[in-house]
């Protein structure tokens, strides 16, 4: 777990560091994990890379392998952004599906300041009336570990038809019989988190669905309707939010280069190839050598 990153923990002879769910770690945390030992090999895994990670693969700092095939028999999850005006119709459609359902809310309890953002506790009470013929369960992070496990066990066993929950189900939940994911306040989540939540369904041969409710659906959220690949979503996120600071710790934001553009995807491989060709010849190219030896920040950022 994250305990590996403790400064008091001394580890020697670490040759390989594997980071799963990479998007859940910060830049400093990932650097601390990979610093254990003498420059260990690092393998990071994620279904939805953050913009900075995509940029690092583009700039050649990370080698990339893509797993593009779905498990046999699986179907892509159909995703719809649902306007508030269609909420009642969406509920009626859900009632007819005869399947298990996740309903994810951003908050556990109602907020005094963000009154329009739905909470799991209040939605549980409302939905129990709307879906009066269904059995509902409630899951959130404030429950005791034993109680959380009991709720998940009952949902997996089919004792609950609908699980009202917070994003606590984002990882580690595998319930193939659940085929509908409803996400309230989709604008409150990042693309990576939305894609991870969507991945809780579509785990059987049955068609699965993801319904995204948002008061102001953005292009970022609408992209989920047509894009099923986590990597393609991450590329969209890179274009929309920027790559952050390659030399620093910011994981998004548009870098302010003098000339180059971070999203010149087709040009970057050619630049890499040219840099690799010229680097061994620096002693023969004194002007270029002087540039390379200068502080890179002064070269790439405008005054």
What role is predicted for each listed range?
Residues 1-222, 281-282, 287, 303:
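Inter-lobe coupling/hinge segments of SF2-like helicase ATPases
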Residues 205-206, 217-303:
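C-terminal accessory region of SF2 helicases/translocases
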